[in-house]
Amino acid sequence: MNKAVVLAVVGCSLLLSSCSRNLSVPPKTHPKVGSWNDLFAPDLSDAIYPDGVWTFEDGVLTASKDEAIWTKKDYDNFVIDLEFKTAEGTNSGVIAYCTDMQNWIPNSVEIQIADDFAEQWANSPGTWQCGAIFGHLAPTKSMVKKPGEWNRMTITCHDQMIYVMINGEMVSVMNMALWTSAKTNPDGSEIPSWLSTPFAELPTHGNIGLQGKHAGAPIYFRNMKIKEI
C-alpha cells in the first residue's frame, strides 16, 4: 500500500471517527434547517394516512380523527425539527423507528406531545407528559407552552440514542439499550402493559409518524423538517 493510499485511509477513518463522536453528543441548540428536506410534501403525496383525516392548509398539518400519518420512507439515523401547537387537553406525539404501522404502539418509540396544563395530563405520570419518551422516560422539565402557542421541538435519533429538545431546552435523553424489560423502566417505574416490546430489542429504523386527534383534542404541526445523519 503506497503512502497516498495510507493517508487517504487514515483521513477517512479520522473523519468517520469525528462524525461518530459528534453524533453521540446531544445538540445544544435547535438547528438551522434551511437546506433540510420536508418531512411531508405539501400535497402529502409522500405520506400514508387514511383518506380525509389529515389536511395540510396554509402550512399547518392537522387531523380530524385519531389516526396517525406516516412517512412512506424508512429512516434510521435522523434529526426532525418541527413546530407544534396544542389545544386544551391535547395528547399526541411523534413516532420514530416504527416497523409495523398497523400495530405501531408496541413497535415504535413515541415522543410525547401533550397539554401539560390540562388536569388529566398534569396529574399523570411524568412519562405521559410533553417531551417524555412515552411510558418509559419522563422529561427533566416541562417546557411546553400554553394551548394556542407554537412550540419548537427537535428530535435526534442516532442508533439507540434519542435526544428531545423543546423550546431550547434538552428535556429527554435516552439510551434504548438500557430498557431491557417490557414491564419496568431502569428506575423501577412500571411500563404500560400495551408497550410490550423492550426498547433494547426494537430495530433502530422504520417509518416516522405523527399521532392524530387523540383523546378528543386536536394537534397542529408546521415547519416539519428532517435531515438524515
Residue ranges and their predicted role:
Residues 8-17:
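Bacterial N-terminal signal peptides
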